[in-house]
């Protein structure tokens, strides 16, 4: 649902994807297609989404892209001699600020879009949610395969960023895979429980057909709930991932660090 309500999927692609020209040229169509897959948009809704996304993309190209380029330049210069926790904190704070600016811009249009949904479109969303939930439950049931898939993806991502590893390094990577991707069912099932609860609340809100201001307030509160001071579980997860980044940073060779910097 996150990628539906704020059109945020597109903006996250922009911040992480190197093919930004493609995104800026076709992002409005992509978001329209994505939303249509959940709601089955009518012509008026489709036109609204594409027109507003063109405006948001132009804003992003003019305002946020230069900031992002400066951000990457800073990371490249700081990363040459390794990273520190304070540098990671600073980088994450800048990323959060970017998120807030993006959300503040998208929320009014997202709220307006939600006020134009019909009962049938909300039912379409519910069916799509049910399909995705079924797929997730299948993954939970095949937990061993899911864990193995994550481990394989982890190694592929490491090689994409840092290049090839020697046999000694591969032993350490295998150790991290075991430590970081356990077969514990609790995190997966807890996320599924939270997902189902959130979906029930969202569908109930949509079916109450509130006005635009109510949707804006709800979206603002929802995005603020991602903040570190509110969501302690998220804070713990972010800290854990930062520590893992520092572990990897100390583990790689200077040549592998340069490889990662070039990948930026």
Question: What is the meaning of each model-derived region?
Answer:
Residues 13-16:
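C-terminal motif of bacterial Sec signal peptides marking the signal peptidase cleavage site
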Residues 32, 199-264:
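A cross-kingdom marker for long, charged
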Residues 35, 49, 106-117, 125, ...:
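Short, structured motif recognition centered on aromatic/hydrophobic residues
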Residues 110-221:
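Extended amphipathic alpha-helical interaction segments
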Residues 1-4:
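Positively charged n-region of N-terminal signal peptides that target proteins for export
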Residues 25-46:
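Post-signal peptide N-terminal segment of mature Sec-exported envelope proteins
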Residues 18-21:
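Bacterial signal peptide processing site
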Residues 63-104:
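Mid-chain, structured segments of secreted extracytoplasmic proteins
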């Amino acid at each position: 649902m996150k990628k539906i309500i704020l059109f945020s999927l597109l903006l996250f692609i922009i911040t992480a994807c190197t093919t930004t020209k493609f995104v800026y040229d076709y992002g409005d169509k992509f978001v329209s297609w994505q939303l249509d897959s959940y709601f089955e948009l009518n012509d008026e809704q489709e036109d609204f989404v594409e027109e507003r996304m063109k405006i948001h993309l132009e804003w992003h190209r003019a305002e946020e892209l230069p900031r992002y380029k400066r951000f990457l330049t800073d990371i490249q210069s700081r990363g040459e001699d390794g990273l520190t926790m304070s540098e990671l904190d600073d980088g994450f704070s800048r990323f959060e600020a970017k998120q807030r600016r993006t959300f503040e811009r998208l929320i009014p249009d997202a709220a307006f879009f939600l006020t134009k949904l019909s009962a049938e479109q909300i039912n379409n969303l519910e069916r799509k949610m049910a399909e995705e939930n079924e797929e997730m439950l299948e993954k939970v049931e095949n937990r061993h395969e899911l864990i193995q898939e994550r481990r394989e993806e982890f190694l592929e991502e490491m090689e994409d960023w840092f290049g090839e590893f020697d046999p000694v390094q591969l032993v350490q990577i295998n150790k991290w895979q075991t430590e970081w991707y356990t077969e514990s069912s609790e995190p997966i099932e807890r996320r599924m429980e939270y997902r189902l609860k959130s979906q029930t609340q969202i569908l109930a809100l949509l079916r109450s057909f509130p006005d635009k201001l109510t949707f804006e307030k709800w979206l603002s509160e929802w995005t603020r709930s991602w903040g570190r001071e509110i969501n302690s579980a998220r804070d713990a997860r972010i800290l854990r991932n930062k520590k893992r980044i520092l572990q990897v940073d100390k583990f790689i060779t200077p040549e592998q660090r340069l490889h990662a910097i070039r990948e930026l």
